[in-house]
Amino acid sequence: MISENAPSSPSSKPLLRALRGEAVWPPPVWLMRQAGRYLPEFRAMRDRADFLTRCMTPDMATELTIQPIRRYGMDGAILFSDILILPWAMGQSLEFIDGRGPVLGAIRSEADLARLDPKRVQDAVAPVRETLSRLTKELPDVTTLLGFAGSPFTVSCYMVEGGGSRDFAETRRMMQTNPALFDRLIDTLTSSTAEMLCGQIEAGAEAVMLFDSWAGILPPSAFRRYVIEPTRQIVEYIRARHPKTPIIGFPRLGGIMVREYAQKTGVNTLALDTVADPAQISELVSEVRPGLTLQGNMDPMILFSGGETMIREAQAIRDAMRGKPHVFNLGHGVMQHTPPENVAALVEAVRAV
């Protein structure tokens, strides 16, 4: 256990304050994929169990979540899990293969979709809720606990393709040739994601994040239909049950569509990818969502490279957002071979006054 202190109030948690719209200085910092293979202590646990087992074993998932907090004192601890836990929980086969990534039984027909059972989800993900419950007791009092899920469109891409893809051709084909089937898949994921995130909040998550990693492959009309609308429905559902819980949305590579995303989804925080300029995006969305928190967005490659260039870039992003609600993060996940000392230097640079 890291902390023996009495429970703190939300006002003492810098990340939670920023996610609720406060301009905190210096900005809170956490990193996507901060619990990952770049850490030697993470690699040491890889030999003990496969990836899915680590996600679904509370002892392991708790330890993996805490590792970057213990090492760096991050302001946020994001649950160690995976966006594909949801389709697995509904009954889709899932295996993580070294060098290849996730492999799922592809959804290509009505019969394939019919084999999934959303009613299984809450029981199947009970170990995830147990992990969150344990983390509420073991994290430092100033650390905000983050839950997360994949957004419906991104999760559907993996479900239809049967894994990762360069172009998600089968997903795009289904959208065109069998839109009714694809719509049912999106609807199923939307309701199940909303319910699963509420379960995470009830288990202890203080904020949740929706990862839409492949949002940027869609043209505007499809982006509205399959990214904005499902996200809006999820936010609405969560807010009805947990009105004070901040929600972070990450429509990666959404480009100009992020303005409409910010306006219509209702997320509290807009996470930015590496190609976005935080100051420009802040100005772009200020008319439709004044006071919206932005999160991001240093290039993970700059973190990988380290040195003075990294320090200058990190502080330039930080300084450009001074006086506005901002959470420092990357524009994508920490790269596998990133030197751990670079992460330490980054956190120090962001926090330097």
From Swiss-Prot:
Record keywords: Cytoplasm, Decarboxylase, Lyase, Porphyrin biosynthesis
Cellular compartment(s): Cytoplasm
One Pfam family cited in the UniProt record for this chain: URO-D
GO biological process terms on file: protoporphyrinogen IX biosynthetic process from glutamate
CDD domains in alphabetical order: URO-D (cd00717)
Positions with a binding annotation for substrate: R33, Q34, A35, G36, R37, D82, Y158, S213, H332
PROSITE patterns from the UniProt entry: UROD_1 (PS00906), UROD_2 (PS00907)
Domain of life: Bacteria
Gene Ontology cellular component list: cytosol
EC supergroup of this enzyme: lyase
Record-annotated site: Transition state stabilizer: D82
Matching InterPro entries: UROD/MetE-like_sf, Uroporphyrinogen_deCO2ase_HemE, Uroporphyrinogen_deCOase
Enzymatic reactions: uroporphyrinogen III + 4 H(+) = coproporphyrinogen III + 4 CO2
Pathway info: Porphyrin-containing compound metabolism; protoporphyrin-IX biosynthesis; coproporphyrinogen-III from 5-aminolevulinate: step 4/4
Record-listed E.C. numbers: 4.1.1.37
Gene Ontology MF terms: uroporphyrinogen decarboxylase activity
SUBUNIT field: Homodimer.
UniProt-listed HAMAP family: URO_D
Cross-referenced PANTHER family: METHYLTETRAHYDROFOLATE:HOMOCYSTEINE METHYLTRANSFERASE RELATED, UROPORPHYRINOGEN DECARBOXYLASE
The family this protein is said to belong to: Belongs to the uroporphyrinogen decarboxylase family.
Role this protein plays: Catalyzes the decarboxylation of four acetate groups of uroporphyrinogen-III to yield coproporphyrinogen-III.
Protein name per its UniProtKB record: Uroporphyrinogen decarboxylase
Biological source species: Gluconobacter oxydans (strain 621H) (Gluconobacter suboxydans)
Lineage, broadest ranks: Bacteria, Pseudomonadati, Pseudomonadota, Alphaproteobacteria, Acetobacterales
